[in-house]
A protein has these predicted regions:
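Residue-level recognition of well-ordered secondary-structure positions
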Residues: 1, 26-27, 73, 109, ...
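Catalytic strand-loop segment that frames the active site of acyl-thioester-processing enzymes
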Residues: 1-21, 110-180, 194
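Residue-level preference for alpha-helix termini and adjacent loops
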Residues: 11-15, 25-28, 43, 48-49, ...
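Solvent-exposed, flexible loop/coil residues
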Residues: 16-20, 30-34, 53-54, 60-62, ...
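HotDog/MaoC-like acyl-thioester-processing domains
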Residues: 49-142, 216-219, 223-259
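Acidic/His-leaning functional-site neighborhoods
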Residues: 145-223, 227-234
Length: 259
């Protein structure tokens, strides 16, 4: 929560241990361990891996303490042909160990540029078609300032990829400096929804989906633009303000009714 900029006043409950409430996007951290990515027999080169999409469905509010079991599966593989990209879609079910309660379903996609081998495209994208963000002005906007130490703070959650902290590694990957974790940017989008649309009630977030477009750098401003589709449904995108580039696109948010 601290890594997403939650602090005082209405957000004290997200950072004060005596009144602690979990944020819904914490489920992404619980489900982040994907051991198959590093198994030699897969032939996957994680150094060339890009984060393509992330999705979250919250079935029950996350407890502030406890143990969970994560059941994962490969949901689909799309090979776009020789010299083109391969996309691997996955799904992780977060289960509370003590009660067997299904807390959340986390999905996502990793993209491997140039890894295609099939003659002709094979496979199909699982799930629904990504949401198209409408043209025109957003119904609601929220601007966050991403702290310069945001990647170091988020790294404490267990994502130790040096791309987000080592300037030399970032330069070798083609970036000016270390970039912010994609899942941290996802978390900022969720936090913007809680602040602007949910009156700080984290329990109202039911579904969240994004497609990653361009990384954002710590120290930049992030503008989240929400477009109302229905009473509790929004399309959204996130923009790095200083460079005026979209960093999260095809965003889709579904809220629960107010209690």
């Amino acid at each position: 929560s601290i890594g997403l900029g939650h602090a005082a006043n209405e957000e004290l409950k997200f950072v004060f241990d005596e009144k602690l409430v979990s944020t819904p996007t914490f489920a992404m951290i619980l489900a982040h361990h994907l051991p198959w990515l590093r198994q030699p027999e897969t032939g996957i080169d994680v150094r060339k891996m890009l984060h393509g999409e992330s999705s979250l469905v919250v079935h029950h509010p996350l407890p502030k303490a406890g143990h969970v079991t994560v059941h994962g599966r490969i949901a689909g593989v799309v090979d776009r042909g020789p010299g083109k990209s391969v996309s691997i879609y996955f799904e992780q079910r977060v289960i509370e160990s003590a009660t067997a309660s299904h807390l959340a379903t986390v999905g996502g996609c990793f993209v491997f540029p140039g890894a295609g081998v099939a003659v002709g495209a094979t496979g199909a994208r699982p799930g629904t078609t990504p949401t198209k963000v409408p043209d025109g002005c957003a119904d609601i906007e929220f601007v966050d300032h991403i702290p310069k130490n945001a990647a170091q703070l988020y790294r404490l959650n267990g994502d130790r990829n040096t791309l987000h902290v080592d300037p030399e590694v970032a330069r070798r990957a083609g970036f000016d400096r270390p970039i912010l974790h994609g899942l941290c940017t996802f978390g900022y989008a969720g936090a913007a929804a809680i602040r602007t649309l949910c009156d700080h009630d984290a329990g109202r977030v039911e579904k969240l989906h994004v497609r990653y477009s361009t990384p954002i750098y710590p120290g930049e401003q992030l503008r989240t633009e929400f477009f109302r589709i229905d009473t509790n449904e929004y399309a959204f995108r996130c923009i790095a303000v200083e460079r005026n580039v979209t960093v999260l696109e095809a965003g889709h948010l579904v809220l629960r009714n107010e209690k």
